[in-house]
Swiss-Prot record:
Residues at which Zn(2+) 1 binds: 175, 180, 197, 200
Motif placement: Bipartite nuclear localization signal: 232-248
GO biological process, one term: negative regulation of auxin metabolic process
Annotated protein name in UniProt: Squamosa promoter-binding-like protein 11
Record region (Disordered): 74-96
Role played: Trans-acting factor that binds specifically to the consensus nucleotide sequence 5'-TNCGTACAA-3'.
Keyword Zinc carried by entry: yes
Residues involved in Zn(2+) 2 binding: 216, 219, 223, 235
Keywords: DNA-binding, Metal-binding, Nucleus, Transcription, Transcription regulation, Zinc, Zinc-finger
Induction profile: Negatively regulated by microRNAs miR156 and miR157.
Amino acid sequence: MDCNMVSSSQWDWEHLIMSNPSRTEDDSKQLPTEWEIEKGEGIESIVPHFSGLERVSSGSATSFWHTAVSKSSQSTSINSSSPEAKRCKLASESSPGDSCSNIDFVQVKAPTALEVSVASAESDLCLKLGKRTYSEEYWGRNNNEISAVSMKLLTPSVVAGKSKLCGQSMPVPRCQIDGCELDLSSAKGYHRKHKVCEKHSKCPKVSVSGLERRFCQQCSRFHAVSEFDEKKRSCRKRLSHHNARRRKPQGVFSMNPERVYDRRQHTNMLWNGVSLNARSEEMYEWGNNTYDTKPRQTEKSFTLSFQRGNGSEDQLVASSSRMFSTSQTSGGFPAGKSKFQLHGEDVGEYSGVLHESQDIHRALSLLSTSSDPLAQPHVQPFSLLCSYDVVPK
């Protein structure tokens, strides 16, 4: 057996063998060895373990036994936490006078620095249920390290650096009027976006980069003062587009195209509030046809003109007697009469429906220049709904 380092227990074993030189060679030949090796780390040492003890014949053997047993127990207690060791077993058959029949050799490696630290950490474990006992030195050291790292991260220099970076990425919005430079951090989002304070956004004349300007609330930009009208906060160009969208042409009826429903032509007419012309009696000419309107009361008669979907233009004449009549030989109106019901005195709202006459061919023959009523085109009846305002005198 080759060993690099010889321990005290090995020296005692060799000393015992040398004390009996007569049986050294014979015993070494007769003793078969059986090794059980386990890998480990650290300093190697050999500790004998006696599996059986019959008698001790000499004092040197007795002293060796006590020394070996004490050292083996000490090494076993120290290396109880060590996971690996080398174990060699020596089984010998000696004479009846020998005191040992079976000897175990344990080759143990001493724990390294890492194993010592692990053993010290495991010493904190409680014997009951594996709970960790409180170690003031162990936990106090870890708490101090954690607190030191946290305090280092929260130093004023680090916080100031972060705030400085945030300040550089988010500039403070200020008013761009010359001489103002008002902080707009607490202002409305509209003023922060366009960089103008509320006071200067309503001023009739401000100075921006040395030029006279005025803030347009419609364009949200600064324009020259000449582009604004007096007492107007929006530029003239934007106001013209705004008014054009809101204004409607007057004197024109907005008519829906004719549609066929239940074999009848329906026409809707909306009156835009234009003052009505008062006429006593008028003569209307349309192509080869002449319309003669004779209302019963001519004091407050008026005329309505509108255009149908087929392109023909028709006129209706009504009077304050709440009766109106119209006739056409070729334009699509049947001869008939309709009453207008007034909801109240001088209210100015009228509604009426033009009904089909009982004898349409007879009505057309009376107004037509042709003597043959069958030569006239067929006209479909329709309903007319009117609503308008009358300007009182």
